[in-house]
Amino acid sequence: MKGRSALLRALWIAALSFGLGGVAVAAEPTAKAAPYENLMVPSPSMGRDIPVAFLAGGPHAVYLLDAFNAGPDVSNWVTAGNAMNTLAGKGISVVAPAGGAYSMYTNWEQDGSKQWDTFLSAELPDWLAANRGLAPGGHAAVGAAQGGYGAMALAAFHPDRFGFAGSMSGFLYPSNTTTNGAIAAGMQQFGGVDTNGMWGAPQLGRWKWHDPWVHASLLAQNNTRVWVWSPTNPGASDPAAMIGQAAEAMGNSRMFYNQYRSVGGHNGHFDFPASGDNGWGSWAPQLGAMSGDIVGAIR
């Protein structure tokens, strides 16, 4: 595996030196961040181009998924999360899509403009493979709040693409009765979104189809590396990022831990500290804390 990864890195560097092109639009990075590109990646499923911040670093990448109040043009991981500086020089690429606010990064049954699972698991990795020389699979997905859910779901349902999942303050048991009610109420309050358009009404049962807790055995069977962080403190410096439901995420993360262990999972790091913010004051340094694990899993 290490030999294959070394070969991929060598081929990626060689390809990059010949200037792989694409239809992306490059923009100037912010002054304090490591140099990165602002790409516009086409999404046929959503019928529009999606803004993606991209930091070249190797053939395997970490995909960073925002909290509920995701930035429309630049990922909050780039701005509040300082992700480009944190991950620069580590031998991996960084992929941070914007525009996924109040979406759960899933495919909505009744909203064609929200087909995030298709974009993140197929359209985006295929585009990056063709236009930036990345490997088609073997990546990591990391996210906060709704992004924590999205990261775990991508790894569970698309193991050919993602071999690492990191969740911070994530909603990892959405089909739980208390949780689906909290998500529905919070997304309506903060985003004006009706979640019946996502997976239908919770009582119809389709929320379970998309639930990492229900499908934790897939993560265990594939030996996917998982990292879960959620503080005992239910406070959130930015309530909109957590749709006012930080306590629900805390409970979800612990229930997910118990389920993961019960189905034989043994490749996880779980941290439930007494202190910490369900917000960027903790999520940004937590990305640094897990960066060694990410690199070890995908580089």
From Swiss-Prot:
As for subcellular location, the record says: Secreted
Acyltransferase: present as a keyword of the record? Answer: yes
Report the leader peptide range.
Answer: 1-26
Q: Which Gene3D superfamilies match?
A: alpha/beta hydrolase
The Swiss-Prot or TrEMBL record annotates one GO molecular function as:
zymogen binding
Gene Ontology CC entries for this record: extracellular region
Predominant subcellular localization, coarse grouping: secreted
Family matches, as Pfam families: Esterase
Q: Which keywords does this Swiss-Prot/TrEMBL entry list? A: Acyltransferase, Secreted, Signal, Transferase
User: Signal: present as a keyword of the record?
Assistant: yes
Q: How does it assemble?
A: Homodimer.
The UniProt entry's sequence similarity note says: Belongs to the mycobacterial A85 antigen family.
Alphabetical list of PANTHER family matching this protein: DIACYLGLYCEROL ACYLTRANSFERASE_MYCOLYLTRANSFERASE AG85A, ENTEROCHELIN ESTERASE-RELATED
What role does it play?
May have a role in host tissue attachment, whereby ligands may include the serum protein fibronectin and small sugars.
Q: What is this protein called?
A: MPT51/MPB51 antigen
| Gene (name only) | mpt51
